[in-house]
Regions:
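Cytosolic ends of transmembrane helices, especially the final helix of ABC transmembrane type-1 domains
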Residues: 1-28
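Alpha-helical coiled-coil oligomerization motifs
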Residues: 13, 20, 30, 241, ...
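An intracellular "coupling" helix at the cytosolic face of ABC transporter transmembrane type-1 domains
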Residues: 14-17, 31-34, 61-66
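Conserved E/DxxT/N motif and adjacent residues on the DHp alpha2 helix
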Residues: 27, 34, 150
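ABC-type nucleotide-binding domain
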Residues: 37-38, 42-294
Length: 294
């Protein structure tokens, strides 16, 4: 006689899950349409002009809700080819700043320019084309290794794919697979987290965009794998402007500029040595990490 009760309880749980999913779906459908940008004729990299990667933040302000700013007045000038690290506690605004740079959200005030061109004056797709991303949460879709790496770059050659894999130290592993570069992968493939991140780095290298976003790319792997990934990162960042978001401060000592954020504001900036010498928030954060490691 308990079976009907169990079935009723199971049905009730399913209804609860459906209600939660429906709320998210309808919330998405009710979002306002994005602005029509078909009238924007300016393009980054148009007329054969290569995008160098100079980035200028000028008095940027942003809040997810009106009247509740989380980034109050952010300004920074980044030269082409520089490596910029953004550090700070959880909720400081690090990832939000990168999302604004790529125009995933519109800023409330100020401006963001790439090579002197305000990103608001060009279509979003054109802004997105200037970036490659390597995220902590890597993804692999069902397809061959070759297809996974070439995903972001239509028309890429086999040689470019293999050269990228050699540069990140993944070529030997791929050739040990049953079908090499033609081995079919999916989310359940027996790739380690580190191998997935190396594949993502190879994908970004093939894309060859002038600006890189490296978000928490080494925070979930062991020390040896982190070293391999760091070498691949170093190869990837050569000649490109890069923004690195990391909690492991040991990985960004060589950054040209470190922006220390807290509560949406840049409270310190400088090189690793300059910030340590200043003995401020960054120095406390850095020393606390190594005290925990000891």
């Amino acid at each position: 006689f308990t079976q009907p009760l169990s079935q009723f309880a199971q049905a009730f749980q399913n209804l609860q899950r459906c209600a939660a999913a429906a709320e998210r779906v309808f919330g998405f459908l009710e979002e306002p349409e994005m602005e029509d940008e078909s009238g924007k004729s300016a393009l980054l990299g148009a007329n054969g002009h290569e995008v160098k990667g100079d980035v200028e933040f000028s008095h940027v302000q942003f809040g997810y809700e009106p009247g509740k700013p989380i980034i109050h007045d952010f300004s920074a000038s980044v030269k082409a080819g520089q490596k910029v690290a953004i550090v700070g506690p959880t909720g400081a605004g690090k990832t939000t700043m990168v999302n604004l740079l790529m125009r995933f959200y519109e800023i409330s005030g100020g401006s963001i320019a790439i090579d002197g061109v305000d990103t608001k004056s060009v279509p979003r797709w054109n802004v997105h084309d200037q970036f490659s991303m390597v995220l902590q949460d890597t993804w692999v879709f069902r397809g061959t290794v070759r297809e996974n790496i070439a995903y972001s770059k239509p028309g890429v050659t086999n040689k470019q794919i293999e050269d990228a894999c050699k540069a990140v130290g993944l070529d030997h592993f791929i050739r040990s697979l049953p079908d090499g570069y033609d081995t079919v992968l999916d989310d359940k493939s027996s790739l380690s987290q580190g191998q997935k991140q190396l594949l993502t780095i190879a994908r970004a290298m093939v894309q060859d965009a002038p600006i890189l976003i490296l978000d928490e790319a080494t925070s979930s792997v062991d020390t040896r794998t982190e070293e391999l990934i760091q070498k691949a990162m170093d190869a990837l960042t050569v000649g490109r402007t890069s923004f690195v978001i990391a909690h492991r401060l040991s990985t960004i000592r060589d950054a040209d500029m470190i922006l220390v954020m807290n509560h949406g504001d840049v409270i310190e900036r400088g090189t690793h040595d300059e910030l340590l010498a200043a003995g401020g928030f960054y120095a406390d954060l850095y020393n606390s990490q190594f005290a925990l490691a000891d």
